Amino acid sequence: LSIEAAEINGFAGLHSFAVAQYDRKWILIGGRTDGLHRRQPFAAFSPDGNNTNVIVIDPQTKQSWSAGIADLPPAISEQLQSTNMQFIQTGKTLYLIGGYGYSKAAGNHITHRSLIAVKLDGLVAAIQKGGTINSHFRQIIDPIFALTGAQIGKIGDVYYLVGGQEFQGRYNPMGP
């Protein structure tokens, strides 16, 4: 095993994001732009550090493209900028579950309670052409999806969602 650092034009880095691959490109969604969240409850997971773009990276050419998520419905755009979503790719579809972050609609930090299906082929094409991305996301809302920091896997035709937790309100690394 060997690892080599690579610089991607226009990409500053992310933390705790979801990733998929399509057409030899990486698709990055969610996470934080400010590195590890701060440990003080009043400052942890500030909305200012949310990743508010869907980013496409071509690792061969070292190019990147992005599209903002502000025009998506709030329930989708808020979840897409959360941290530690569970994610799994099946074919041309990326599934995103839960994630933790600030919700303007709730007026507080929440663990999101939905599953979002992302159509990768259309999304990548739209982002590279500077088009609209709205039609490439579908969402199902159910409290069963309110998880962050879990893992999802697939054995045969069955998906398994394991572990994780649900935080409501400001995250406190020192306990309740």
Regions picked out by a protein language model, each given a short descriptive name:
Residues 4-52:
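Beta-strand-rich domains and repeat architectures in extracellular enzymes and scaffolds
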Residues 22-41, 96-106, 159-175:
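Glycine-centered tight turns/hairpins at beta-strand boundaries that repeat
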Residues 115, 127-176:
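Aromatic- and glycine-enriched pocket-lining scaffold segments that form the walls
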Residues 8, 43-95, 101-103, 141:
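Blade-loop segments of beta-propeller domains
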Residues 21-24, 89-92, 154-157:
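Residue-level detector of Asp-centered blade-edge/turn motifs that repeat once per structural unit
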Residues 15-19, 78-87, 146-152:
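Beta-propeller and closely related beta-sheet repeat lectin domains
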Residues 1-11, 67-72, 132-138:
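A short helix->beta-strand "capping" segment at the edge of beta-propeller domains
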